[in-house]
Amino acid sequence: MSPKELAEAVNKRRTFAIISHPDAGKTTITEQLLLFGGVVREAGTVKARKTGNFAKSDWMEIEKKRGISVTSSVMQFDFQGKRINILDTPGHEDFSEDTYRTLMAVDSAVMVIDSAKGIEPQTKKLFQICKMRGIPIFTFMNKFDRDAREPLDLLNEVEDVLGIETYPINWPIGSGHQFKGIYDRFNHRVALTHPADENNPYLPLDEDGNVEGDNPLAGDGEWQDAMDGMELVEVAGNELDQEKIAKGDQTPVFFGSALTNFGVQTFLETYLQFAPAPSDHKTEDGDVVKPLDPEFSGFVFKIQANMNPRHRDRIAFVRICSGEFDRGMDVTLSRTKKPMRLSNVTEFMADTRENVETAVAGDIIGLYDTGNFQIGDSIYNGKKDIQFEKLPQFTPELFVRVSAKNVMKQKSFHKGINQLVQEGAVQLYRSYSTGDYILGAVGQLQFEVFKFRMQNEYNSEVVMEPMGTKTARWIDPDQLDEKMSSSRNILVKDIHDQPLFLFENQFAENWFKQKYPDVKLTAKL
């Protein structure tokens, strides 16, 4: 591919993550976007368990049974000349680490807000990560087909709580049973929820923002409220500023209903006008890798086992940061400096796959992994070593001892635990004194998902013995003396054979520091 062809291909890419608090409608809007991309003919409804019509992005068995997203899904489609890569992330706070890593692999984010509830805790946490990265954030105020808060209240809350300017692209006309449509100030039209002609749901606006010709909503109370709200925004609201949007200092706001697919097309079309093409990525030594650099590079931000349970396979998800990927190319794994050939590569629609012949910066590809990759690994095909910045890793707070319920299933148990730990949702430790397996996690749901998947995917029922909340602190191996261990500070080692203590509480940690003042303890490696 020539430099000109590479530039054209890269500039067509739009890669974004969808973030929200659980149940705000994140997965539903993902489904509707796939409809516009022609990927699915009808959206799977998360709550409709009896029909078996599950969300396309919720592909894992436990997600289908519980109606929650506990793993990031990757989906790709073409729309209006652009190649769109969507990463649908877990909404549940126990799986924040997976979401945080995913946000390192995108160029922008879509924040979905339940319009009846406004800003919720998980939304705020994920927004801060986006803000820290300085990526553009687009806001979709969802569920206006139900009773919702006043639009101005929602905008003010976003500005006050999140500290970002808002610019409403459109404005809702009513909500709930009185949801009449959307006033689209950006595209100069009104979209009706119940138009007289279903093939033409739009009313054009003149230069002054008034409906041209007959207005079926004229005299309607919801219409007048919407006009009053729009007038206030026009006079006292923020000016549209594309530079601020690019820096993540202003968020375009869209109102609509993902469930009824109203306002989603307006969002997608407008998003493509503002969203950035693939961006630069920093390396650990301070260099910047640009998307149009001719040499291929990328990093592993996610590992997923058993996307096809029949084959017990494992996929390493790679964000391409620069250049072009061609099937069969040779690359170097930065961590080991070992060469490898990328022959078996795939792209995704959740759990559905297609082989990839070529891909460019901005794309997400999947590498079949036989144990070579770790989360955070960098790969490249140039002469210069590239190691991208480290991905965030959370220190676990909850711990359980785990063992196989059936001693005859040890082989399945060990295979399952080793593969699932590679995904990074739970951390694995071994006791120095007993050799027991110990799992660490941020939240209880991670243990439940691990237990379910061990039985469902590896036919290995496990027994978990809660150890409660602990404080994990790593120690330099040169300073370690196994006699330091006690019932209040259990000595274990992680999967890299690095020693650490699990302290019972803050008092136990303080007591240890007083007894061994020269020993340095760290919260993370």
Swiss-Prot record:
Classification via Gene3D superfamilies: P-loop containing nucleotide triphosphate hydrolases (3.40.50.300), Peptide chain release factor 3, domain III (3.30.70.3280), Translation factors (2.40.30.10)
UniProt keyword Transferase, yes or no: no
Pfam family, any one: GTP_EFTU
Cell compartment(s), UniProt: Cytoplasm
UniProt KW Transport keyword: no
GO MF, one example: translation release factor activity, codon nonspecific
SUPFAM superfamilies hit by this protein: EF-G C-terminal domain-like, P-loop containing nucleoside triphosphate hydrolases, Translation proteins
Positions bound to GTP: 20-27, 88-92, 142-145
InterPro entries associated with the record: EF-G-like_DII (IPR053905), EFG_III/V (IPR035647), G_TR_CS (IPR031157), P-loop_NTPase (IPR027417), PrfC (IPR004548), RF3_C (IPR032090), RF3_dom_3_sf (IPR038467), RF3_GTP-bd (IPR041732)
Cystine connections: none
Record's keyword terms, sorted: Cytoplasm, GTP-binding, Nucleotide-binding, Protein biosynthesis
Domain of life: Bacteria
GO BP terms, alphabetized: regulation of translational termination
Residues of the tr-type G domain: 11-279
Family to which this protein belongs: Belongs to the TRAFAC class translation factor GTPase superfamily. Classic translation factor GTPase family. PrfC subfamily.
Name of the protein this chain belongs to: Peptide chain release factor 3
Gene field: prfC
